[in-house]
């Protein structure tokens, strides 16, 4: 179902965010994009 797809995307996004968070300034960039 659609919910399963959303959960899968959320997991992938979480992994990407964790990888980016290890880079300097990446967290700041993500915060700017979310606003």
Curated annotation (Swiss-Prot):
GO cellular component: extracellular region
Record's keyword terms, sorted: Amidation, Secreted, Toxin
Modified residues (Glutamine amide): 35
Cell compartment(s), UniProt: Secreted
Domain of life: Eukaryota
Sample GO molecular function, one term: toxin activity
Main location: secreted
Tissue expr: Expressed by the venom gland.
Family: Belongs to the cationic peptide 04 (cupiennin) family. 02 subfamily.
Protein's name in the database: Cupiennin-2d
